[in-house]
Swiss-Prot record:
Matches recorded under NCBIfam families: pdxH, PRK05679.1
Gene label: pdxH
Family named by the database record: Belongs to the pyridoxamine 5'-phosphate oxidase family.
Reactions listed under catalytic activity: pyridoxamine 5'-phosphate + O2 + H2O = pyridoxal 5'-phosphate + H2O2 + NH4(+); pyridoxine 5'-phosphate + O2 = pyridoxal 5'-phosphate + H2O2
PROSITE patterns reported for this sequence: PYRIDOX_OXIDASE
EC number: 1.4.3.5
Protein name as catalogued: Pyridoxine/pyridoxamine 5'-phosphate oxidase
Role: Catalyzes the oxidation of either pyridoxine 5'-phosphate (PNP) or pyridoxamine 5'-phosphate (PMP) into pyridoxal 5'-phosphate (PLP).
Organism placement in taxonomy: Bacteria, Pseudomonadati, Pseudomonadota, Betaproteobacteria, Burkholderiales
Quaternary context: Homodimer.
């Protein structure tokens, strides 16, 4: 039987060099994300979101990034969920994109702010009706007694709002505004390439690029 200690692969698909890296991290992310799309990876917009609660306990979960530009990385959720409560207490987060098929990771850290109501409304209106009803039906992260309770709430809100449910006041977007972004490319013998962009107003393009030891 294979033991956990024996599970390993040697990464050799690509390299990451300072000379080839984009001058700003958003352009570099766009480049890698488009390569993930071209490789037809399943849901390349999935990312791990890590937060810390008022009690100092960390928490992580998978969410979907729904917008990326020079301002940051946007996701949407229930503001009253555990992640929402964490961010209310400590408005900082870490993100991780992991594209194992390309032997790549992108790590992002920064402060978090809510998106505007207009931006949240616009995205909410683009969602399927069932997902919009679900945002009303689910009191996210609270204990319920059964699946039947959730389905009853879904039915009640569907009857109430029909095909045009409005955005709940407790549901909307967050933007992670990065101060550091690390691009990790797997390499042979665990001597991986790691380039980190650090926000620096005095630097060209507003970012410095450094190589980290693997």
């Amino acid at each position: 039987m294979t033991t956990l200690a024996d599970l390993r692969i040697n990464y050799s698909r690509a390299s990451l060099d300072e000379a080839d890296a984009a001058p700003d991290p958003f352009a570099q992310f766009d480049r890698w994300f488009n390569e993930a799309l071209a490789a037809k990876l399943p849901e390349p917009n999935t990312m791990t979101l890590a937060t810390v609660g008022a009690d100092g306990r960390p928490s992580a979960r998978i969410v979907l990034v729904k917008g990326v530009d020079e301002r940051g990385f946007v996701f949407f959720t229930n503001y009253e969920s555990r992640k929402g409560r964490d961010l209310a207490a400590h408005p900082y987060a870490a993100l991780l994109f992991y594209w194992i098929e390309l032997e790549r990771q992108v790590r992002i850290e920064g402060r978090v702010e809510k998106t505007s109501a207009e931006e949240s409304d616009r995205y909410f209106a683009s969602r399927p009706v069932g997902s919009r009803i679900g945002a009303w039906a689910s009191e996210q992260s609270t204990v319920i007694d059964s699946r039947a309770t959730l389905e009853a709430r879904e039915k009640a809100f569907s009857e109430r709002y029909g095909d045009d449910p409005p955005r709940p006041p407790h549901w909307g977007g967050y933007r992670v505004v990065p101060d550091t972004l690390e691009f990790w490319q797997g390499r042979p013998s665990r001597l991986h390439d790691r380039l980190v962009y650090t926000r620096d107003a005095a630097a060209p393009h507003g970012w410095t690029i450094s190589r980290l030891s693997p």
